Design a protein with these regions (language model features):
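Positively charged n-region of N-terminal signal peptides that target proteins for export
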Residues: 1-4
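Bacterial N-terminal signal peptides
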Residues: 6-16
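PEST-like low-complexity, intrinsically disordered acidic/proline/serine-rich tracts
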Residues: 18-275
């Protein structure tokens, strides 16, 4: 079964009226915003409260483009007008040429088709949803993903600094160091390889990529996400993108594996837990 984007999964579930995780994601948001949940020590809680269930589901956009830019894309990150490609981000000349090639080629060289997991902000656009869990025992945050082969990210919260590229390199998820700035979780990552795509639509990057992500929860049902992309070999300057993600109350992140889908067709469709 072909991998379906989040928007398609939500539409199918809504039309069918089924009681699935995707259907929950399409449910109406509460008319009155609920307060941001917190741990007993006052720190923002990004996961469900004790005894509750839920996860972060649908993002407000389907791909990356620089903050303030207005471009039309479909759920896969394909531009409605290829002439808009140079406006998406401040590309170096070689990078915009590669981005346009990938767009014109219908994203056929997307590594996810060969079961190579996405990384960086693209994780937040994969079907299946995600959770952000605090681990005070080991002073870490874990970001668990239902899609993208059920990967997880480990964010070190023990005060360590992001390593230099010569110290850590060639990884898919990077070395991730986090800290709190008020109620905002700030995660700095580096040490990436260039074999994955960090966005739907095929934005290029090199091993010089550094990401600064900012997670905040202004109310119970909203996650605000901001990412600054810094890769001087690919872009002429650092640039920032942002979007929001909706909370799916009472659901569980979906199960999705890709081990048996190495035929170039892409991962199979995720299913709800227990199906």
């Amino acid at each position: 079964m072909r991998y379906l984007p989040v928007a398609a999964l939500l539409l199918v579930a809504a039309l069918a009226g089924c009681d699935s995780a995707s259907d929950s994601a399409s449910a109406a948001r509460p008319e009155v915003s609920r307060p941001t949940p917190r741990y007993p020590d006052g720190q923002v809680r990004f996961d469900s409260e004790p005894g509750g269930r839920g996860y972060w589901g649908r993002a407000s956009v389907s791909s990356l483009f620089e903050k303030g830019v207005q471009v039309a894309m479909d759920e896969k990150g394909l531009l409605a007008n290829i002439a808009d490609a140079p406006r998406v981000a401040p590309f170096q000349p070689w990078a915009v040429a590669l981005y346009e090639y990938r767009q014109r080629n219908g994203l056929k060289d997307d590594p996810i088709r060969a079961c190579i997991a996405p990384s960086g902000p693209r994780h937040l656009h994969t079907a299946g949803g995600f959770r952000i869990i605090r681990d005070p025992t080991y002073d870490r945050m874990y970001i668990l993903f239902g899609g993208g082969n059920r990967n997880w990210r480990v964010v070190f919260m023990d005060g360590r600094e992001p390593p230099n590229p010569e110290e850590v390199s060639g990884t898919y998820f990077g070395h991730q160091a986090g800290r709190w700035e008020g109620d905002t979780l700030v995660v700095e990552s580096s040490g990436y390889n260039a074999r994955f795509w960090f966005s739907n639509g095929g934005l290029p990057h090199t091993e010089a990529l550094r990401l600064t992500e900012r997670f905040s929860r202004p109310d119970f049902d909203t996650l605000k996400y901001e990412v600054t992309v810094d890769d001087p070999l690919t872009y002429t300057r650092p640039w920032t993108a942002e979007w929001t993600v909706d909370w799916v109350d009472g659901g569980e992140i979906a199960e999705q594996f890709c081990e048996d889908r190495r035929d170039g067709l892409g991962p199979s469709e995720p299913t709800s837990a227990g199906e």
